[in-house]
Structures are given as C-alpha cells and as structure tokens.
C-alpha cells in the first residue's frame, strides 16, 4: 500500500485534473448552445429551397433533371463528417462503424464507392483502411468560417461533378443526428438523387397543374439551368446543415464526456481518501503498539 505522502500527492493530482475537466464541461456547454442556434438557423433555408424546387419541378414536369431521378447503382459516394478534435466519447467511432457497415454491404453487392471526408478524425481513420478511395478532404474551423465554407464547397463540388459525369450513381451524407443533449446517433441520408421531394399525392397534383396551367416563376435564364442551380444550392445547404448539426453533437458529447470524467474524479478522490485514512490508522496503531512495548520493557 502507498504511504500517506504518495496518496496526498495523488489526491492533489486528481483534483487538478478535475478542475480541468469541469472547466471543459462548462466551455462545451456554452459552445453547444451556440451550435444549436446555428443548426436551427439553417433549417428554414433548406425548407425554402425544398419548396422552390417543388414549384420549379412542377412547372417543368417533363424535364429529366439528373439530380432528381434514380438510375442503376454501380458506384456510390459518401460524404463523411467528423470532428477535428477528440475528447467527445464514442461520437466519431460510432459513426465510422455505421459507414463501414454500409461499405461492407456495397462490397458484397459488388458496388464501388468513393469517399469524401470532412474533419481530421475521418481523414485519419479512412486513410488507414485499404481499398478506400478518398477523393476529397475538407475541415470545418469555426474561427475561419469563410475559408472552411470554401474548402467544404470545393469538396462537395468534387462529388457533385462525379455524379453529373456518371462516375457515381448515388451520393450519401454520413453525419451525427442531434437527438438530445445526452443522445446523438449516426445517420446516413441520401443527397443524390434528391429523394422524397414529392409524395405520391403531390406528383399527381403537379401533373394536373401541368395540364391545366398554373402560376409560375419568371425566369431570367432557361428553366432547366435554374433548376440545376437550385438543386446544387439545396445539396450544399443540406451538407452545411449536417455539418452544423454534427458540431452540436460534438459539443454535447464532449460536455457529457467531461461531466463523466469530473464525476469519476470525485469517486477516485473518495477512494484515495479512504485509502489515506486506512494508512493513517495503520501508522497510528503501529506507533501505539511501539509505545506500549517500550513502556512494558521499562
């Protein structure tokens, strides 16, 4: 058993670590609130873009937009979002396991795949794997928002160009979904082709509108060109929304990880104090025994 001085030193060391984890918990909680605000702010833009695409598509019902329709899947693309920093529990590794499960299914079905990674954790993880073709990388830095947006936009454009050129037939976005402060779960959503734009009822209504005539926008350019640009903006907004939601998940996971670390530090301190008291008790008992032995000898 360690002596009393060593135990006191350990207690002080754990207390210092506890102060750090407690401070990191508070910082993560503050950043999480800001990230949730940003996440919620981007949603109205995505919903508005969705509505406009519906209206424009209804006006050009016969135009076979490549971003809207399914085709035979021979190769797929993944945009994988992760964090740049650690200390956020199993947030990243759970997401990577989810993506690898999908990739394994593709390999079994003889479907090829390309990967675009956002965040250093995803870049480091997938770079170590064999047979994973990383075609683009980007990082999101909250201190350099404009530079990050340009870098992410460039990475997304690489995947969009591959889809337009027919090099990939489906594009997925892998990120974490913010369920609550204590719960985040991996999510894989289809970016291209744009799915669930119309329900069956909406498709029927749009066909009736197209035959009867209805209101429409005034286009400065060709309607097909406008629709293509809208689809690209919509995809970019979806990616940005997923990145901001993943950032909120990161801060929530880090806050909980630091809270657990702080609580564990309290448990360790209690155990060390108990060990210290046992050592002190043994020392006192030994001293009393020596005094009694000395008195008996006299």
Swiss-Prot record:
It is a peripheral membrane protein. Keywords: ATP synthesis, Cell inner membrane, Cell membrane, CF(1), Hydrogen ion transport, Ion transport, Membrane, Transport. Produces ATP from ADP in the presence of a proton gradient across the membrane. The gamma chain is believed to be important in regulating ATPase activity and the flow of protons through the CF(0) complex. PROSITE patterns: ATPASE_GAMMA. F-type ATPases have 2 components, CF(1) - the catalytic core - and CF(0) - the membrane proton channel. CF(1) has five subunits: alpha(3), beta(3), gamma(1), delta(1), epsilon(1). CF(0) has three main subunits: a, b and c. One of its GO terms (cellular component) is proton-transporting ATP synthase complex. It comes from Francisella tularensis subsp. holarctica (strain LVS). It is found in: Cell inner membrane. This is ATP synthase gamma chain. It comes from the Bacteria. Belongs to the ATPase gamma chain family. GO terms for molecular function: ATP binding; proton-transporting ATP synthase activity, rotational mechanism. GO terms for biological process: proton motive force-driven plasma membrane ATP synthesis. The keyword Cell membrane applies.
